[in-house]
Amino acid sequence: MYRIYTRTGDNGTTALFGGSRIDKDDIRVEAYGTVDELISQLGVCYASTRQAELRQELHAMQKMLFVLGAELASDQKGLTRLKQRIGEEDIQALEQLIDRNMAQSGPLKEFVIPGKNLASAQLHVARTLTRRLERILIAMGRTLTLRDEARRYINRLSDALFSMARIEETTPDVCA
């Protein structure tokens, strides 16, 4: 039988990828825990939209967040074993998505109040979770090394989610 519990965290510590242990209230755990929360919220967004292109983008974002989560959950030894990290090309892909979506949805004429439909509201929840993650990463970067690409990706991700919510709000007959 495969068990998902190890009992090693019962004392309030957790293992990083690489083997070292840290307290469960360490800012790194807060960061990768928020990444996990965001991945789950993007799954809710995926289930809420009927637009195939948005689903494809959301799934790609989830995969990149797993990459980020692995980096945040790694110690120095673990970092050397990672096969992938967020790079400049990932940031550029988000910028292209934002530009396409904003061109399609048109200029903003007023502040956006979330809730026009379920899918857009869920995307706005994901956007605010992303902003929280960004604040955590900024705080984390004050005491620990954090690659600039990771922080920049999260900054763009919140804008990408906003642009996707705008698509949901401005596309007729897509209310989920």
Curated annotation (Swiss-Prot):
Record key words, sorted: ATP-binding, Cobalamin biosynthesis, Cytoplasm, Nucleotide-binding, Porphyrin biosynthesis, Transferase
MF terms in GO: ATP binding; corrinoid adenosyltransferase activity
Pathway membership, UniProt: Cofactor biosynthesis; adenosylcobalamin biosynthesis; adenosylcobalamin from cob(II)yrinate a,c-diamide: step 2/7
Localization terms from the record: Cytoplasm
Reactions catalysed according to its record: 2 cob(II)yrinate a,c diamide + reduced [electron-transfer flavoprotein] + 2 ATP = 2 adenosylcob(III)yrinate a,c-diamide + 2 triphosphate + oxidized [electron-transfer flavoprotein] + 3 H(+); 2 cob(II)alamin + reduced [electron-transfer flavoprotein] + 2 ATP = 2 adenosylcob(III)alamin + 2 triphosphate + oxidized [electron-transfer flavoprotein] + 3 H(+)
Keyword Cell membrane applies: no
GO biological process: cobalamin biosynthetic process; porphyrin-containing compound biosynthetic process
Positions annotated to bind ATP: 6-14, 24, 131-136, 155
GO CC field: cytoplasm
Enzyme Commission number: 2.5.1.17
Bridged cysteine pairs (disulfide): none
UniProt-listed SUPFAM superfamilies: Cobalamin adenosyltransferase-like (SSF89028)
Keyword ATP-binding recorded: yes
Family according to the record: Belongs to the Cob(I)alamin adenosyltransferase family.
Protein name as annotated: Corrinoid adenosyltransferase
Naturally occurring in which organism (per UniProt): Citrobacter freundii
